[in-house]
Swiss-Prot record:
HAMAP family cross-referenced by the UniProt entry: ZupT
PANTHER family for the chain: ZINC TRANSPORTER ZUPT, ZINC/IRON TRANSPORTER
Binding-site residues for Zn(2+), renumbered to this chain: 123, 148, 152
Subcellular location: Cell inner membrane
Binding site for Fe(2+): 120, 123, 149, 152, 181
Keywords in alphabetical order: Cell inner membrane, Cell membrane, Ion transport, Iron, Membrane, Metal-binding, Transmembrane, Transmembrane helix, Transport, Zinc, Zinc transport
Protein name as catalogued: Zinc transporter ZupT
Species of provenance: Shigella flexneri
Family statement: Belongs to the ZIP transporter (TC 2.A.5) family. ZupT subfamily.
Membrane protein topology class: Multi-pass membrane protein
Positions of transmembrane segments: 5-25, 32-52, 61-81, 109-129, 137-157, 171-191, 195-215, 236-256
Length: 257
């Protein structure tokens, strides 16, 4: 099994961590969840804008028009898909002050699971494609996606457990969204393999960079602010950028990057 596929599977499996936290009642503080989302956004923004997009533009045979065009395509494509999908957000189910009937919780959890699954599928493709092109960047994206997936698993499993009383059902429902990400990676592995040209890979990387920027700005940072409105998610973003930038410098200095 390829390393990029393993990274994608591990990132998707992080959803189960959140699911177990949801059914065990060991809910992390809102401050920690918000910081982790900001941290993930910082990692994605730095990798996308400082590594992936420049690498795609520098690829042999890649034109600036195609490179920037694919970046904008990924950016706008994410926003378009995000607007079309059923929209129930994790924070809607994580607020203890909201009292919902079991039927209402079930319905909201179904919509949330569906929406998250559809969002996670392209994230799996993005993780695999990035790791296939540059393993160093793949580790960073996998870490960011994993941090993003933990609150999602928590948000689905907690309400389902409250509605059904079944820990197994709650973990299963939460796991579906993580499996969607893994399926995305498997699909990319089966279709792309090693038979893809450098220009096509660079174009895909540029589009993935656009998707990651849109995800960070439109989903992760606003979600962090809603989960913990008393603190600025920018601290997590800056910390994520700093840690990722420092780690990239260390890897490149060691000759790994």
């Amino acid at each position: 099994m390829s390393v990029p596929l393993i990274l994608t599977i591990l990132a998707g499996a992080a959803t189960f961590i959140g699911a177990f936290l949801g059914v065990l009642g060991q809910k992390p503080s809102n401050r920690l969840l918000a910081f982790s989302l900001g941290f993930a956004a910082g990692i994605m923004l730095l990798i996308s804008l400082m590594e992936m997009l420049p690498a795609a533009l520098a690829a042999e045979g890649m034109s600036p028009v195609l490179g920037y065009g694919m970046f904008i395509f990924g950016l706008l494509g994410y926003f378009g898909l995000d607007r079309m999908l059923p929209h129930a957000h994790p924070q809607d189910l994580m607020q203890k002050s909201v009292q919902l009937l079991p039927k209402s919780i079930k319905r909201t959890a179904i919509l949330l699971t569906l929406g998250i699954s559809l969002h996670n599928f392209p994230e799996g493709i993005a993780t695999f494609v990035t790791a296939s092109s540059n393993l160093e960047l793949g580790f960073g994206i996998a870490l960011a996606v994993a941090l993003h997936n933990i609150p999602e698993g928590l948000a689905v499993a907690g309400p389902v457990y409250a509605a059904t009383g079944s820990k197994r059902t709650a973990i299963l429902w939460a796991g579906i969204s993580g499996l969607a990400e893994i399926l995305g990676g498997v699909l990319a592995w089966l279709i792309l393999g090693s038979m893809i040209s450098p220009v096509v890979m660079a174009a895909i990387m540029a589009a993935v960079a656009g998707i990651m920027v849109a995800l960070s700005v439109d989903e992760l940072m606003p979600l962090a602010k809603e989960i913990d409105p008393n603190n600025n998610p920018s601290y997590g973003v800056l910390c994520g950028m700093s840690v990722m930038g420092f780690s990239l410098v260390l890897l490149q200095t060691a000759g790994i990057g």
